[in-house]
Amino acid sequence: MNELTSRLNRERRFLVLLGVICLALIGGALYMQVVLGEAPCPLCILQRYALLFIAIFAFIAAAMPGRKSLTFFEVLVVLSAIGGIVAAGNHVYILANPMVSCGIDTLQPIVDDLPLAKLWPLAFQVDGFCSTPYPPILGLSLAQWALVAFVLTTVLVPLGIYRNRRRG
């Protein structure tokens, strides 16, 4: 096995790990929803979509045989993470400034009309308000943790591409 193949395999393992972590985060959100009674808002659901897209694209990328197809799906992973940054960043802003929320989430009908909301309503249907604060986890709100995860994904995936291909 040459050095480039070894680097690409390391990159693929990282992508599989990233996909598993994203699915675990969705599972954790479902646990908090069902067991702890923390109802998801439209921005929570959009963050779940971003995590799901990251996982799907990461798994597809890990299965790609060539460098170009692998890179294409890694770009989709990063774009999904940027979408997650937008949703989580907006959510963090609303939680920090509850007065900007009018109490009515205008995103709810849009998010509830997305296909997965009809296929799997428990996981992808809106049931709460974005301005509802829940107890922090290790000092950060769930939206802040999601923002950290999306930023790390946006930084680490391109860094891995650069690191694993700079000599290849």
UniProtKB/Swiss-Prot annotation:
Manganese found in the keyword field: no
Subcellular location, record wording: Cell inner membrane
Gene Ontology molecular function terms on file: electron transfer activity; protein-disulfide reductase activity
Disulfide bond is among the record's keywords: yes
Family per similarity comment: Belongs to the DsbB family.
Annotated Pfam families: DsbB
Transmembrane segments: 15-31, 50-65, 73-89, 145-163
Membrane topology according to the record: Multi-pass membrane protein
Organism ancestry: Bacteria, Pseudomonadati, Pseudomonadota, Gammaproteobacteria, Pseudomonadales
One GO term describing the cellular component: plasma membrane
Species whose genome carries this gene: Pseudomonas entomophila (strain L48)
Keyword entries, A-Z: Cell inner membrane, Cell membrane, Chaperone, Disulfide bond, Electron transport, Membrane, Oxidoreductase, Redox-active center, Transmembrane, Transmembrane helix, Transport
Alphabetized Gene3D superfamilies for the sequence: DsbB-like
Record-annotated disulphide pairs: C41-C44, C102-C130
Stated role: Required for disulfide bond formation in some periplasmic proteins. Acts by oxidizing the DsbA protein.
Membrane side Cytoplasmic: residue ranges: 1-14, 66-72, 164-168
Periplasmic-side positions: 32-49, 90-144
Record's protein name: Disulfide bond formation protein B 1
Matching PANTHER family: DISULFIDE BOND FORMATION PROTEIN B
Gene Ontology biological-process entries: protein folding
